């Protein structure tokens, strides 16, 4: 599987551990940075990776910042991208099977490398539960607002 990886300065070490794990499993990794030699701001890395995953250039993505939360918020602004902060393997599996997440975000300051590898494995080894009742799940009311942003909403008021 072709997996995009990215991190801010707080996630470089964990991203590298995840990358080595994925390469050992035979995955292709597209590392967009940052690195110890070339740190990049979290928002820049997130936009680039979300673009690659949203366009299909990468099948899945893993982003690592201080807590994972900021990158998830930004990634979810991209069309066709569902990103979830995952702090354990069960959450990663549910993010895939129920929410169809294609990017997970991890906290470089709060997630141990061994746990990150378990989380990534659960994420990659779980499929989306297709065939579920979207109407009962309330997907349509959410999709109506898919291109809304905070700024568009406050301008209307």
Which sequence ranges carry the predicted segments?
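C-terminal binding/interaction regions
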Residues: 4-6, 10-11, 89-157
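Short, structured coil segments at secondary-structure junctions
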Residues: 25, 78-79, 99
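Residues at secondary-structure transition points
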Residues: 9, 13, 37-44, 66, ...
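A short beta-strand-loop structural module common to alpha/beta enzyme folds
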Residues: 28-40
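Helix-adjacent hinge/juxtasegments
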Residues: 45, 49-85
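Glycine-rich phosphate/diphosphate-binding loop of Rossmann-like nucleotide-binding domains
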Residues: 5-24
């Amino acid at each position: 599987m072709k997996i995009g990886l990215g991190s801010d300065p707080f996630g470089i070490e964990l991203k590298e551990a995840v990358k080595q794990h994925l390469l050992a499993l035979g995955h292709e990794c597209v590392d967009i940075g940052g690195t110890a030699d070339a740190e990049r701001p979290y928002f820049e890395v997130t936009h680039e990776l979300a673009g690659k995953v949203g366009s299909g250039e990468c099948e899945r993505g893993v982003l690592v910042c201080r807590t994972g939360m900021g990158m998830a918020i930004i990634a979810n602004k991209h069309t066709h991208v569902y990103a979830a902060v995952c702090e354990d393997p069960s959450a990663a599996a549910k993010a895939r099977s129920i929410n169809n997440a294609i990017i997970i975000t991890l906290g470089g300051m709060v997630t141990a490398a061994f746990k990150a590898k378990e989380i990534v494995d659960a994420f990659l080894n779980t499929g989306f539960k297709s065939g579920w009742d979207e109407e009962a799940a309330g997907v349509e009311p959410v999709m109506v607002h898919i291109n809304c942003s905070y700024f568009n909403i406050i301008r209307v008021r």
